């Protein structure tokens, strides 16, 4: 695991892991390792790094309303859009139906038996500077 505070630290540490003959090991990091921009030149040092990413970040063109997700503040936009959509669906999702789900911009959101919300993100890996879903 790699626990950088930001993408600059991830860009500094990941090449060191590769240099010390550990490049074939899977390296996982929190989403803070991602700048939110698919820039091959900027992200080339992150090759092979795996993170959990929201659908709006991975495929903004295929997620309705995700146009604003391509920029770093897009995560906040996605969270607000999902909060509004969940508020509109809450009566249906909390009606006692276990595993009611909603596929939103921040991932698949499901309700458990107790009414607790669970969010599932997608595993992605940097490949030639671009974040791709695994």
Annotate each predicted stretch with a short phrase:
Residues 1-134:
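Extracytosolic ligand-binding ectodomains
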């Amino acid at each position: 695991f790699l626990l950088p505070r930001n993408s600059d630290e991830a860009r500094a540490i990941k090449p060191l892991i590769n240099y010390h003959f550990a490049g074939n090991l899977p390296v996982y990091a929190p989403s803070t390792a991602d700048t939110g921009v698919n820039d091959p030149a900027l992200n080339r040092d992150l090759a092979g790094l795996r993170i959990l990413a929201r659908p709006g970040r991975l495929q903004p063109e295929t997620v309705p309303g995700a146009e604003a997700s391509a920029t770093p503040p897009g995560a906040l936009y996605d969270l607000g859009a999902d909060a509004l959509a969940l508020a509109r669906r809450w009566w249906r999702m909390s009606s006692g139906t276990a595993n009611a789900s909603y596929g939103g911009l921040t991932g698949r959101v499901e309700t458990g038996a107790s009414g607790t919300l669970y969010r599932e993100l997608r595993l992605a890996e940097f490949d030639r500077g671009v974040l791709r879903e695994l």
